[in-house]
Amino acid sequence: MGALHRAHGQLIKSVQGFGSLQPAAVLVSVFVNPLQFGPAEDFDSYPRDLEADCELASRSGASALWAPSVDQVFPGGASSQFRIQVPSHLQAHLCGAIRPGHFDGVVTVVARLLALVRPEVLVLGEKDWQQLVILRHLVAQLGLPVRVHGVATVRDDDGLACSSRNRYLMTQQRQQALALPQLLARAARESQDGRAVDLAGLRCAWEQLGLEVEYVETVDAFNLQPLHAGRKLCLLAAAVRCGETRLIDHTFLMSRQPIVAIDGPAGAGKSTVTRAFAERLGLLYLDTGAMYRAVTWLTQQHDVDPHDPVAVKTILENLELELEPSQSGPQKVRINGHDVTEAIRSPEVTSSVSVVAAHGCVRKALTAQQQRMGVRGGLVAEGRDIGTAVFPDAELKVFLTASPAERARRRALDLDNRGFPVPDLAELETQIEERDRMDSTREVAPLRQAEDATELISDGMSIEEVIETLIDLFRVQVPEEVWPTPGS
């Protein structure tokens, strides 16, 4: 809304990290929206400095700045326009409860902006978290052709979240206001240690320091309904007044780092994109398929009948299986001291892995090991039953798939690149369909899409497009403030 500061500059600069999907131009829109202000709020006195805004936008890398008048955005006046109404459950708490009609005004003007500009990407700050959640719902439910990109809250050196309204604060008031982020941060640390958030205690502490508390609440970070801290990502948010200045801030509460589960059939490209996705976001990559392949390789080395669960179980005793991150190429896989990184990709292993993986003793042993690896989170795992059996509480679940014909084509390329003989495409497609049948009909942990997973069909998509889609899905569930993108 203008009065740009360095947090707005960070929004503009963030576009430079979009890689090959970076938009050709970056437009900054400056518009003090009358629909967002209540009758007694500061619309008339809201800070405006267009010359300074233009300078900051240019310095930060903007291609242009658009500062329309009210008549340009709302021909005939704001009161004569249709308005979009935000679903009541999304604004029943936090700022929505305190400022009735505010978010209706936000979505109405943003929808108007998107219709006029038709951007590829909409960049928003995570500081106004409720606004970001509501606008993501708007884009998703209306099917608008735009990606929503969130940027972590930017803070001044003293810890106060950047805001255009901070300039209202006198020196002494700013010192008072610092209690807002400081006590939120302390509550987050205590929550990590297993202590419950004391909302009444926070309110009392702020009031004793001279701040007027409008609200302090814990809500689900995505449906914005009341929630106590636990496994799910929880938002602890507050709004206070310091003198005449209204300030909002928040922190996220979570018992562990995020987990991503990517399931799908053989040949869907899971390993390739998951490895790149993990590297892009700084997550540990857990290739569970490689673990099953390694056990299959071991059965072949010991001449064990892969169909005999009793015989297979004997080689699981004292099993030493290691996955070692690699700076380049596939993840290193070692079993009982043997480096089997390449060997487990052979056609011989591929033809038997479904049989071995179907045994309950194998899945029990490897699932337990995978869950131990993921106890602290901070990882992405790919396989067949990650979202349904291994990490059913993962923050993001994706079912990555492609048509059998497309998967056969990819398998042929992979075999050729590895120096293995390449069967006819029709034969490969038949093998893949049979593998799908075996994986989806086995009694133990069959291949199936988790109820809360997002299906991603990758036919016709480049590897980079699949990775960017996964990142977008991740950021809907995991804010930058919870898991920052490396180098951001």
UniProtKB/Swiss-Prot annotation:
Residues the record marks as active site: 8 (proton donor)
Q: Name one GO cellular component term.
A: cytosol
List, in alphabetical order, the Gene Ontology terms for molecular function in this entry: ATP binding; CMP kinase activity; dCMP kinase activity; pantoate-beta-alanine ligase activity
The residues that cross the membrane are none
Cite the binding residues for beta-alanine. 36
- For this UniProt record, give its keywords in alphabetical order, as a comma-separated list: ATP-binding, Cytoplasm, Kinase, Ligase, Multifunctional enzyme, Nucleotide-binding, Pantothenate biosynthesis, Transferase
**Superkingdom field:** Bacteria
Write out the ranges of the annotated region (Cytidylate kinase).
252-488
Q: What is its EC number?
A: 6.3.2.1, 2.7.4.25
Q: Which reaction does it catalyse?
A: (R)-pantoate + beta-alanine + ATP = (R)-pantothenate + AMP + diphosphate + H(+); CMP + ATP = CDP + ADP; dCMP + ATP = dCDP + ADP
Q: Could you tell me which residues belong to the region Pantoate--beta-alanine ligase?
A: 1-251
Give GO BP annotations, semicolon-separated.
nucleobase-containing small molecule interconversion; pantothenate biosynthetic process; pyrimidine nucleotide metabolic process
Give the protein family: In the N-terminal section; belongs to the pantothenate synthetase family.
Free-text function comment from the UniProt entry: Catalyzes the condensation of pantoate with beta-alanine in an ATP-dependent reaction via a pantoyl-adenylate intermediate. Catalyzes the transfer of a phosphate group from ATP to either CMP or dCMP to form CDP or dCDP and ADP, respectively.
Q: What is this protein called?
A: Bifunctional pantoate ligase/cytidylate kinase
Q: Which gene encodes it?
A: panC/cmk
